[in-house]
Amino acid sequence: DCADACPEQAIDLSSPDKIIRDKCTQCFKCVDVCPSGALERCGNDIDMDHLVEKVLEDEAFFEASGGGVTVSGGEALMQMDSVGELFSRLKQRNVHTLIQTARLFHCNVFENLVLPYTDTIYFDLKLMDSDAHKQYCGVPNHSIHENFRKVQALARDSVIEVLPRVPLVPFITDTDENLSAIADFMLENGVKNMQILPYNPIWLDKLPRFGSVQRLDFGEGTGKFMPDAELDRCTEIFESRGIHVHCHR
């Protein structure tokens, strides 16, 4: 059965989650032998030629709307070689390119492989306190902030648009202290425009799909959309410093 087929012993049918995600290497041997078809691959392997061909099927829509291609994640820049090749081929057809990143990457490699073919960068900033960033995101934020400074400096000497974004999470990223620190950091680096991403509780229902039976709760408001008054408070922290805020409500 699937448990016996797994070379990493990542399937434990007696556990609530069934699949131990930390052990799974996505070899898909369990999928190949699953007798009921309950396990299946999500996504497909695709080569660059096929990917570019699929993307360019919408080229007429890009031209008519002024749109283009956004690469997101996860962290898309964990695959910098592929992103760079994709963007370079799209720019040969004058397709607008945008990348969304949390900026945990080697900036010199990014500057050589991806930046020359990028029109717009969405840069997510979550927490200014490094200890809190490590607690909630798994890593400190020193290199992220340094990358932000470098990319901002590069963008000032080019036509690249950089739009910093702050995802709002109740009692974690949306505190006055954290948002004020982010706003001051943006000012130091010449930011004039940014975007706040209102909290969306729909993610809670996605947990079981990722094999988690634990329902996270970080206080009142976890299961609710953020009220307009709270969005106004967050917006004012940036606009009081002269930073224009984009917010889709």
Language-model segment annotations:
Residues 1-22, 29-45:
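Iron-sulfur cluster-binding cysteine motifs and their immediate structural context
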Residues 37, 92-93, 241:
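Conserved dinucleotide-binding and phosphotransfer motif residues
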Residues 42, 197-199, 248:
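Conserved beta-strand termini and adjacent loop/short-helix elements that scaffold enzyme active sites
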Residues 49-209:
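Conserved AdoMet/S-adenosylmethionine-binding subsite of the radical SAM
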Residues 184, 192, 207-237:
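A structural motif corresponding to the C-terminal lobe/cap of the Radical SAM core domain
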Residues 240-249:
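Radical SAM enzyme core and accessory elements
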